[in-house]
Design a protein with these regions (language model features):
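Membrane-embedded alpha-helical bundles of multi-pass transporters/translocases
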Residues: 1-533
Length: 533
């Protein structure tokens, strides 16, 4: 029988493996956003790009996340009932069905871009709105490629191959970087939209051979009567909303920001990118690893083991996001300045983005926890509850936006997301307890208290950055200054992270001790080899 410690150890070990690939992808993402800010800044064109992306990316995200999420339980049923060959049949059939749906959406998007633009840019001035309409038409093919990526992600995650799905940000960001470095001055903002489409295609090209290595074989299948595909589509409908609440909140916020003058939508875009970078590195890894495990345990009725996996997952999320929130609040200004303030991105833009990032960072914990909770619901075949919680989240966010937008600008919009998502987490926990019984709430409270204590110590360490920053700025200038600040910031963050982990270890956190045990084991296993060599 697998105990809670081994469940936590397995999750921790797998998370470490996939996090490395995600981290590399996000490093490329950091350079991509820095280049974007340098070339386009917070201009009218960048406002239009962020608004168009909010619309097309939301549609694409609906398709990708819903398919990747519903693929696993449906594929599990198909494989259990008929064997591995049925899984291939199901995968190819789902690719065909989603491709047809995507083609319809693309045609509608190209024919009716004005209506889609209303989703994200109804408050924009006529000139910006016209650019948004054009960019939506150019960007709509992303929906098709996103559907392919969603299916391949689901296939690989179900097969336990997380490294490839963790690395897909690399081809996406490389596509952007090549465009920004070589072609941006010639093709402009339309080219950036084309790069965003080609980046998703590059992800599919990257995933396909990895899927084929573990048994996937492409075939032309069009069976609209297949019960497993029908089940996946039925499951996907409510999942569309629940897994994309953050995207929906983003599109609502940018819509309101489009009426706040030039640069407001761009400020939200850049701030949200920095905030979601944490989610993209760590939380994506956890949910990708945990979901197949939850599907097999909770889906088969093993509630005891499923709850242990859930407990380890939620606590791991807390151990990552609480210190990340503290760090972002303290270091928001240097992070924004180092990442963006150069070229077309002004110091004034940096000040606005700093305060907005701090408000966005308050949502890190709640967005991450709700992602895990949603996967638990899906694992027990419940897609309706996350749907209702997601709708509630959006309604609260919209209501708060309308109350605070005029008074607090982009800060108010970002804070509204944080408040709405936090309320949604509490609602989701309460409903989940009613559905599956005791959740081990005491262990979560203990974990939260310990991580807050350790995070406060870590936060005190990060304050050491600022006096040295003044010295660096006094002695250097230009690119040398930026590089020096970046290196020292990374050093301070690294030291603070070590102090944080040490504090958790001393506080007796089991998950941290599991990770330390894994590291020690690897070091000890390598010692004999070193001696022999």
């Amino acid at each position: 029988m697998e105990n809670k410690s081994s469940a936590g150890s397995r999750i921790a070990k797998s998370t470490l493996a996939i996090t490395g690939f995600l981290l590399v992808g996000k490093v490329f993402g950091f350079f991509r956003e820095s280049l974007t800010a340098y070339v386009f800044g917070a201009s009218k064109e960048m406002d239009a790009f962020s608004l168009a992306q909010a619309a097309t990316a939301m549609i694409a995200s609906f398709v990708t996340q819903a398919i990747a999420t519903t693929y696993i339980p449906s594929a599990q049923k198909a494989e259990s009932d008929h064997g591995p060959s049925r899984k291939n049949y199901f995968t190819n059939n789902l690719l065909m069905v989603t491709s047809l749906v995507s083609f319809v959406l693309i045609i509608l998007g190209i024919l009716f871009p004005n209506q889609i633009a209303l989703l994200s840019a109804s408050q924009a001035d006529p000139e910006t709105y016209a650019i948004v309409v054009k960019l939506i038409q150019v960007g709509m093919p992303v929906v098709l490629f996103s559907s392919w990526v969603g299916v391949m992600e689901g296939y690989l995650q179900h097969g336990g191959k997380f490294a490839a799905t963790g690395a897909i940000a690399i081809p996406l960001n490389l596509t952007y970087i090549v465009y920004l470095a070589l072609f941006s001055h010639h093709v402009g903002i339309i080219g950036l939209t084309i790069a965003s489409v080609l980046g998703i295609l590059a992800q599919f090209i990257f995933l396909l051979p990895n899927a084929m290595k573990i048994g996937y074989r492409p075939r032309l299948v069009a069976d609209f009567q297949d019960k497993y595909v029908r089940e996946a589509i039925v499951l996907a409908l409510p999942v569309f909303v629940s897994v994309s609440v953050n995207d929906i909140n983003t599109i609502v916020n940018r819509n309101l920001a489009s009426g706040m003058g030039q640069g407001a939508a761009s400020i939200l875009y850049y701030s949200n990118k920095m905030n979601t970078m944490i989610i993209g590195i760590f939380i994506t890894a956890i949910t990708a690893i945990v979901f197949p495990i939850l599907t097999r345990t909770l889906g088969s009725g093993d509630m005891k083991l499923g709850k242990k996996v859930m407990n380890a997952s939620v606590k791991t999320v807390l151990f990552i996001t609480v210190p990340a929130t503290v760090g972002l609040i303290i270091l928001a200004r240097p992070i924004i300045e180092i990442a963006f303030v150069r070229g077309s991105f002004t110091a004034a833009n940096g000040v606005a983005a700093t305060s907005t990032l701090r408000c966005y960072s308050l949502s890190l914990i709640s967005i991450s926890v709700i992602n895990v909770l949603n996967r638990i619901y899906y694992s027990i075949g419940d897609t309706k509850t996350p749907f209702y919680v997601g709708v509630t989240n959006v309604i609260i966010n919209v209501g708060l936006n309308l109350l605070v937008a005029r008074h607090f600008g982009t800060n108010g919009l970002a804070a509204s997301v944080s408040i709405a998502t936090t309320i949604a987490v509490f609602i989701s926990f309460i409903l989940l307890k009613k559905k599956i019984g005791n959740l081990g709430t005491r262990s979560y409270i203990k974990a939260l208290i310990k991580t807050v204590m350790a995070s406060l110590v870590m936060g005190a360490i990060t304050l050491a950055y600022f006096p040295y920053e003044k010295l660096i700025m006094a002695l250097t200038s230009g690119g040398v200054q930026t590089l020096s600040r970046l290196v020292f910031l990374m050093l301070v963050v690294f030291i603070a992270a070590l102090v944080y982990v040490f504090c958790l270890y001393k506080l007796g956190v089991r998950e941290v001790r599991d990770v330390v045990g894994i590291v020690r084991e690897k070091i000890e296993n390598r010692k004999p080899k070193s001696i022999e060599n």
